[in-house]
């Protein structure tokens, strides 16, 4: 039995040895020349590329065409790139051929640019024409999707032919042939009108002939448009108002003087005073009784003064009345009233009383302020809208300094009052369905019973609490 071949197991160290050869390359000692190598396959000498295991060496050394198993005599790629270049031959450009080709390319490019410019200009003109047609209503506006409401021309032609070329609202006055019915003939009148014309003696037939369709049309009344311009009120300064009043009075005085000169108005009596009574009557008549004349002048002066005072009083009353009416018109009666109740220990300081009174008047509050004697405790009730009551609460609770000392002015002299123990507190806040207060007033009561009776007149005695004071 021959010894075991340890190299056939594929030991890599042994295979890389220079003394190692594959089994198919080992020569056999035989006398047969035909069998030079031992192995399976064709009895052909192996290619030299198969004798090396270095692939990089094979790739550099051998070409594809040299491999008889891979080479193709009809394959042009088997030759090298240099051989292919020589097979094509050398081609030389003629003189001016390159410049001519470049000029042709430039000319072609210029023509393409001109055509593109013409196309853009034509497209812009088409867009303008299309926009005009859309504005005139000849084409639908695609942005508003008007194309969805286009009329089908085929259906419209059938409709147009069936109605003899008239609209649907005119078909009621046409016969089957598409002609106007006899009773609606514009050249004549209807049978009902002819019968009515026989009963009436005077009938104006010309109007019916000229306007025969008026009797079938309901004409609406033309709307009257007020073309009067709305005048914007101008707000003037005090100096401008004075100048305007002065000029207006001057123009009225000049107009009155012109009427007196023309005799349209009687001449006014002279304004006689004690200082000018002699000069007034020197030109008219002699004074026989100066004492009586002096009495007449004094009576005229008193009369003018009395009229002047009465006129001022009347204007003052009218102004007050207008202001009250304006306030009543602007102020709406609320559904509920906001009410706040405060109780204090002392209200001798006249500055505090003035602030309470003036703020209640300016804020249009209703209610009262009662106190027991000048140096006693009291109560404040205010009723109004929520904003005014909130402002008044801020005044009473934060802005007014109740514990601030002050000097009380009396007939005997000034007395310094110590108010460090004085204070005020809010006892109640809420809403009232009805308000019995007509306005806001202040009152000094002699005792607590008198204060409660005053509150009872307005159903407010439950607001007062002696414990708080």
UniProtKB/Swiss-Prot annotation:
It holds the Pfam family Prp3_C. Its main location: nucleus. Keywords: mRNA processing, mRNA splicing, Nucleus, Spliceosome. GO terms for cellular component: nucleus; spliceosomal complex; U4 snRNP; U4/U6 snRNP; U4/U6 x U5 tri-snRNP complex. GO terms for biological process: mRNA splicing, via spliceosome; spliceosomal complex assembly; spliceosomal snRNP assembly. Residues 1-45 are annotated as: Disordered. It comes from the Eukaryota. CDD domains: Prp3_C-like. It is found in: Nucleus. Participates in pre-mRNA splicing. Part of the U4/U5/U6 tri-snRNP complex, one of the building blocks of the spliceosome. Component of the U4/U6-U5 tri-snRNP complex composed of the U4, U6 and U5 snRNAs and at least PRP3, PRP4, PRP6, PRP8, PRP18, PRP31, PRP38, SNU13, SNU23, SNU66, SNU114, SPP381, SMB1, SMD1, SMD2, SMD3, SMX2, SMX3, LSM2, LSM3, LSM4, LSM5, LSM6, LSM7, LSM8, BRR2 and DIB1. This is U4/U6 small nuclear ribonucleoprotein PRP3. It comes from Saccharomyces cerevisiae (strain ATCC 204508 / S288c).
């Amino acid at each position: 039995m021959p010894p075991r071949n340890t190299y056939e197991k594929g030991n890599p160290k042994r295979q890389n040895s220079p003394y190692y050869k594959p089994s198919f390359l080992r020569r056999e000692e035989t006398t047969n020349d035909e069998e030079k190598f031992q192995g399976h396959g064709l009895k052909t000498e192996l290619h030299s590329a198969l004798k090396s295991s270095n692939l990089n060496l094979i790739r550099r050394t051998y070409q594809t065409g040299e491999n008889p198993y891979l080479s193709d005599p009809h394959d042009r790629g088997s030759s090298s790139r240099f051989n292919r270049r020589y097979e094509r031959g050398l081609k030389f450009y003629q003189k001016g051929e390159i410049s001519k080709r470049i000029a042709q390319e430039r000319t072609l490019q210029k023509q393409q640019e001109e055509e593109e410019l013409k196309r853009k200009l034509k497209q812009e003109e088409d867009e303008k024409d299309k926009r005009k047609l859309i504005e005139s209503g000849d084409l639908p506006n695609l942005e508003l999707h008007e194309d969805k409401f286009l009329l089908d021309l085929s259906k419209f032609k059938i409709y147009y032919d069936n109605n003899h070329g008239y609209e649907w609202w005119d078909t009621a006055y046409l016969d089957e042939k598409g002609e106007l019915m006899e009773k609606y003939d514009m050249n004549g009148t209807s049978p009902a009108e002819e019968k009515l014309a026989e009963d009436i003696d005077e009938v104006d037939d010309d109007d019916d002939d000229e306007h025969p369709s008026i009797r079938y049309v309901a004409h609406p009344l033309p709307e009257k448009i007020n073309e009067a311009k709305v005048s914007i009120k101008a707000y003037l300064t005090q100096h401008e108002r004075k100048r305007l009043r002065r000029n207006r009075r001057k123009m009225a005085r000049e107009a009155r003087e012109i009427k007196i000169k023309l005799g349209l108005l009687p001449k006014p009596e002279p304004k006689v005073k004690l200082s000018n009574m002699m000069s007034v009557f020197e030109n008219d008549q002699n004074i026989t009784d100066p004492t009586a004349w002096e009495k007449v002048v004094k009576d005229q002066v008193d009369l003018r003064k009395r009229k002047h005072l009465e006129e001022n009083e009347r204007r003052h009353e009218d102004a007050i009345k207008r202001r009250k009416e304006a306030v009543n018109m602007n102020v709406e009666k609320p559904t509920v009233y906001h009410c706040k109740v405060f109780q204090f220990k002392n209200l001798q300081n006249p500055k505090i009383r003035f602030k309470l009174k003036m703020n209640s008047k300016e804020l249009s509050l209703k209610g009262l302020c009662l106190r027991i004697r000048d140096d006693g405790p009291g109560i404040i009730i205010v009723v109004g809208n929520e904003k005014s009551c909130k402002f008044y609460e801020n005044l009473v609770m934060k802005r007014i300094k109740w514990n601030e000392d002050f000097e009380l002015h009396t007939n005997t002299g000034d007395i310094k009052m110590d108010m460090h123990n004085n204070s005020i507190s809010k006892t109640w806040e809420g809403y009232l369905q009805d308000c019995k207060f007509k306005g806001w007033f202040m009152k000094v009561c002699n005792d607590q019973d008198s204060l409660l009776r005053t509150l009872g007149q307005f159903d407010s005695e439950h607001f007062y609490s002696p414990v708080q004071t």
